A protein has these predicted regions:
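Conserved H-D interstitial segment of serine endopeptidase catalytic domains
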Residues: 191-192
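Short, surface-exposed loop or secondary-structure junction motifs
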Residues: 1-146
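Short, basic, low-complexity termini and linkers enriched in Ser/Thr/Gly/Pro
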Residues: 196-198
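Short, surface-exposed beta-strand/loop micro-motifs that present aromatic residues
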Residues: 148, 155-164
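Short, well-ordered beta-strand elements
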Residues: 159-160, 166-175
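A short, polar/charged loop-to-alpha-helix boundary motif
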Residues: 178-188
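Residue-level recognition of short loop/turn positions
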Residues: 53, 164-165
């Protein structure tokens, strides 16, 4: 959220305006923003909980979908799987998407390398500029590749990008409380299904 304040200070725009101008519009991310348009409201999945029997139920706590004026740097965005795929594809392409250069390749390299040494609490993992980063497969005890980067959202959304395998995987969810079970399970199934190219 400090980054959002810095964006507003140095750009003279709100974080919402800056992200729309510099990221969402160039990537044609029409479904992404801090508020949901009235025509898209029916496409939004409400937040769910599990009851004691494990059944999905609508959560009593729902995010406001319109009228939001606080633009966090770490939370508050609505998006779709197809929009998020465009963002991830740009990262996998080292900052380029359909001929547009949003970031330099070196910027993406810096964003996706471990910046914290061994301070990150998960073994075999580090932290880049906005992403968890796999640094050691044996220590991480997870399938993947060194250099894979990932993150999750508050309602169990999850994505990872594996540059070595040229792979993007996105899991969209609206489930609380946060639990990484499905993200880890999905990653395991994806890597178990990969076939070596000869």
């Amino acid at each position: 959220d400090v980054l959002a304040l810095l964006i507003e200070h140095f750009s003279g725009m709100t974080t919402a305006e800056f992200l729309k101008d510099r990221i969402f519009d160039p990537l044609d991310m029409k479904d992404t923003g801090y508020n949901i348009s009235k025509e898209n409201k029916g496409r939004w999945m409400p937040v769910h909980n599990l009851d004691k029997q494990g059944n999905l139920i609508n959560s009593k706590t729902q995010l406001p979908t319109e009228g939001n004026t606080i633009y966090g740097g770490t939370h508050g965005l609505f998006s779709s799987a197809s929009d998020y795929m465009k963002f991830c594809q740009m990262l996998l392409n080292k900052g380029q998407f359909k001929g547009k250069h949003l970031l330099s390749p070196k910027t993406v390299d810096i964003m996706t390398m471990n910046q914290v040494g061994n301070l990150y609490e998960a073994a075999g993992q580090g932290f880049g500029l906005g992403f968890g980063v796999t640094t050691d497969l044996a220590d991480s005890k997870a399938l993947g590749s060194v250099g894979q980067y990932y993150w999750s959202g508050a309602y169990c959304t999850y994505f990872f990008i594996d540059p070595k395998e040229e792979l993007i995987v996105i899991l969209m969810s609206q489930l609380q409380p946060y639990n990484n079970y499905y993200g880890e399970k999905m990653r395991q199934m994806v890597y178990q299904s990969l076939i070596t190219k000869y």
